[in-house]
Amino acid sequence: MNKFKNIAVYGGGSFGTSLASLAAQNCNNVTLFLRDEAIAKEILHNKTNIKYLGDIKLPAHLQATTNLDIIKDFELIIIAVPSYAFDDSIKLLKTHSISKDNTLLIATKGFARNPTALFSDRLKTLLPHSPTAFFAGPNLAKELAKNLPASASIASLDIDIANKIAYNLSAKIFTTNVSSDIVTLQVAGALKNIFAIKSGIDLARKQGENARATLIVAALKEIAILSQALGGMQKNSDILLEVGVVGDLVLTCYSLGSRNTKFGYELGISSDKKKFLQEYKELVEGREALKLVLDLIKKYNLHMPVISKVASCVIPYVIPAKAGIQHKAR
């Protein structure tokens, strides 16, 4: 199978930098595109990104730049930006001549906004001719950057594209599987952060490990409910058992290294929850995704009690846990 001659990663945070480090294991021409000139120079000269990854050393041949004019020359472009920045990022790349010659791998988790939609649906409008795939897995950024064992699922409507990307990213310490179910992988990636908030709340309330295991089962059911409503899981439910779904879900819910679990835990132990929510400034993807998922629950009249329970803890005046009708998983 052919290798990509070069790979770009757009997004210089912890996850983007770690993905660039991963890609550089198999490709000698990898460039990280970011906005911060100082961090770009640090990566070029010191091979570190202290702000996001501490003193972890990055591959010697990894390049970094703020010059987007050259990104169109890269065969594979990995998008690793926060969900709130997704639309603007794609629009910006479009102004720099991204085309059908560039394959996109979306590593961003969440939903597109205004209106709420899957990233794949938004890309049909913004970049309809670019080959696209989606990336998800139990991948803590610092562990990836340290080359510790990990795995990921890669989904694309074009299974040949998924296989090519998997071939280019796979290594002895990094395994991949492929799927054509892009909907379920995206839904799981967005919802996992909300379930992690619930896991943190339960941890703060000392609900025990039994409750956390039960949460995982309930979470998988609700992922299936929303996925089916959005057109996923048309052939089978095997995707739920892949690392990009249950693997990512378990890691996010069980690790206090997860911002979302940490947020849920701190919310759970807070004596003044209203004040805590008003003053909490750190980005929590699950908190942002929650508002968008509620729109989808209402639109499709779904029964997702765990999501609704988290909403009742985080957002005032939301639908109660019993709202909606039962949408059974097939």
Curated annotation (Swiss-Prot):
The organism's place on the tree of life at top rank? Bacteria
Q: What is its main location?
A: cytoplasm
Catalytic reaction list: sn-glycerol 3-phosphate + NAD(+) = dihydroxyacetone phosphate + NADH + H(+); sn-glycerol 3-phosphate + NADP(+) = dihydroxyacetone phosphate + NADPH + H(+)
Where found, per UniProt?
Cytoplasm
Q: Which UniProt keywords apply?
A: Cytoplasm, Lipid biosynthesis, Lipid metabolism, NAD, NADP, Nucleotide-binding, Oxidoreductase, Phospholipid biosynthesis, Phospholipid metabolism
What EC number(s) would the UniProt record show? 1.1.1.94
Name the pathway. Membrane lipid metabolism; glycerophospholipid metabolism
Locate the active site: 192
Which GO cellular component term is one of those annotated? cytosol
What are its GO biological-process terms? carbohydrate metabolic process; glycerol-3-phosphate biosynthetic process; glycerol-3-phosphate catabolic process; glycerophospholipid metabolic process; phospholipid biosynthetic process
Tell me yes or no: is Lyase among this UniProt entry's keywords. no
InterPro entries, per database record: 6-PGluconate_DH-like_C_sf (IPR008927), 6PGD_dom2 (IPR013328), G3P_DH_NAD-dep (IPR006168), G3P_DH_NAD-dep_C (IPR006109), G3P_DH_NAD-dep_N (IPR011128), NAD(P)-bd_dom_sf (IPR036291)
Cite the Pfam families for this sequence: NAD_Gly3P_dh_C, NAD_Gly3P_dh_N
Query: Any coiled-coil ranges, and where?
Result: none
The record's function comment reads: Catalyzes the reduction of the glycolytic intermediate dihydroxyacetone phosphate (DHAP) to sn-glycerol 3-phosphate (G3P), the key precursor for phospholipid synthesis.
Matching entries from HAMAP family are given as: NAD_Glyc3P_dehydrog (MF_00394)
Q: What's this protein's family per the entry?
A: Belongs to the NAD-dependent glycerol-3-phosphate dehydrogenase family.
Query: Which PANTHER family does the UniProt record give?
Result: GLYCEROL-3-PHOSPHATE DEHYDROGENASE, GLYCEROL-3-PHOSPHATE DEHYDROGENASE [NAD(+)] 2, CHLOROPLASTIC
> What is the protein name given in its UniProt record?
Glycerol-3-phosphate dehydrogenase [NAD(P)+]
Give the organism's phylogenetic lineage: Bacteria, Pseudomonadati, Pseudomonadota, Alphaproteobacteria, Rickettsiales
